[in-house]
Amino acid sequence: AVVDAVARLGGDMLLLVGDVFDHGRVPDSVLEAFLEEIARISQPAVLLPGNHDLYDDNSLYQREVFQHKPDNLHIITQTDGEALSFPELTLDVWGRAMVSHTPAFHPLEGMPTQRNGHWMVALAHGHFHFDDDRDQRSSPIYPPEIAAAPCDYLALGHWDRHVDVS
């Protein structure tokens, strides 16, 4: 399991970049099992909602079960972007919660340019557009946006393949 790997490999943090759940109709028992798994590690876990587990008015992350989440689980909920600071790691994590998976949603929009001397990791859940892509997809992420991103590391979610987009 991913949680076991974080502990075994001595990871500083667990990043969950969207689509942790396939849809918002997941039973509470599954959500409780997820929270129990996260509670097994001492490292912080940061979760960014994606297109399958949106952060909207009916979000599963707003259910009662998440009112009792472990202290190490941090959920990005701001749809215009949010930075979480982890001073003990000299690290800030920024992301933009997805409220709607449409071409109008730009996952990297609003990333802060001001730095406080910490490393900055950005989380973005969307469709990476190669230069030769002709179609307009929802939640687009374009190469110039990545090149201009003022972060030290960008963790992308949504695609199910390994691609270096640096």
What is the role of each PLM region?
Residues 19:
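Active-site rim/loop-helix segments in enzyme catalytic domains that contact anionic ligands
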Residues 2-5, 30:
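Glycine-rich, highly charged phosphate/nucleotide-binding loops
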Residues 13, 24-166:
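His/Asp/Glu-rich metal-coordinating catalytic cores
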Residues 4-16:
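Active-site metal-binding motif and surrounding structural segment of the metallo-beta-lactamase
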Residues 1, 22:
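Acidic/histidine-rich helix-loop elements
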